[in-house]
Amino acid sequence: MSFLKTVPEELTAAAAQLGTIGAAMAAQNAAAAAPTTAIAPAALDEVSALQAALFTAYGTFYQQVSAEAQAMHDMFVNTLGISAGTYGVTESLNSSAAASPLSGITGEASAIIQATTGLFPPELSGGIGNILNIGAGNWASATSTLIGLAGGGLLPAEEAAEAASALGGEAALGELGALGAAEAALGEAGIAAGLGSASAIGMLSVPPAWAGQATLVSTTSTLPGAGWTAAAPQAAAGTFIPGMPGVASAARNSAGFGAPRYGVKPIVMPKPATV
């Protein structure tokens, strides 16, 4: 059908011509019906009567067949006319759709919406809307959690660094916004009023009210350990080995529990005699 080319006007003209032919054939058959279906015997003998009956039967049978052929012809002409009209309507619809391609889609969408308007009750429609809203919120929450866990190794280091820099830039913008809000709260007039009116004290520039002599208040306190008069205790005498930490040779006691302890085990190795 993709290679079929149809001209509706030509189909209509062909149907009209075939209709004319069928009407002419029907008229001829009707004219021949009387002399061919009622034949009189040539004589009064039996043979003439049998011949007349045989010719009458053939004439009657021809009229029956021609009537059936006329019915089939009329049906064909009718079908051809309907097909021509259908092709014409389809061609006009295709032309209008090609001129505005979205009109057909819009019409189909409107038909679908109208068909499904009363399909779901209002309570189910609200439930479906809530499900869609909750699903969208869950997706957003999952995305936020993934971004928050990026520092735990879920993302490569480069992507994590880019995310951190982006967050840092947003924080800096937030601080600038806070400073701007503070300036707006203080007002421009209050800030400009105090400019250039402070007096200098040393290397500082302070308001005039601060230029007076300040009273210094200080108290002395005794440092801990300042009253110690006893001599520092002397370490116990012991035997030390060069290269080892100094530890007493006394027996073990509970004071050294938990501290590292070192032991020395002498190793005696024979030396080869040399001559």
From Swiss-Prot:
Source organism, top-level taxon: Bacteria
GO CC annotations on file: extracellular region
Main location: secreted
Residue ranges of domain PE in the record: 5-93
Cellular compartment(s): Secreted, Cell wall
InterPro entries listed in its UniProt record: PE-PGRS_N, PPE_C
Family to which the UniProt record says this protein belongs: Belongs to the mycobacterial PE family.
Subunit comment: Forms a heterodimer with PPE15. The dimer forms a 1:1:1 heterotrimeric complex with EspG5.
Listed name of the protein: PE family protein PE8
